[in-house]
């Protein structure tokens, strides 16, 4: 009998940088493999599984930029205990969201030069379409964050992402503050946890 947690990793429109980041920790992935069964991960296997299948945990990367993406996202939500957005694209719309600060139709026409049949939906985070249980921010996420997140879920703990700024992490590590040397640093306003 297979008691492993069934996990799916579904990419929407995006660069798949977060999916690649998951592969950064091969030994930890092997360790997780004892407890989870990754049944949908395009970077592991050629055949994609259907979003109609039942999943315990689904990680979604990328932005829902097409009606196909939105349909898949809704199916995944319907068939999953947990839906977790990974990366800035899924969490906030990512780089694609920049088009929302201009005339999106003008940008569309410039990029696609009058090409017909290309959708031009508003860019929204996953949470605009479905309930998202947790988010792992970053562009891309780190493999370590992914591993920690899955591990916390496996032991029944509610996953948490650090809320401390990078400045806090530098102080804990005993590093000197570059601001004291007159150097520019975004540490005070940058969320920590990115190693």
Question: Model features per residue range: what roles?
Answer:
Residues 1-182, 186-188:
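Iron-sulfur-associated redox domains of electron-transfer enzymes in respiratory
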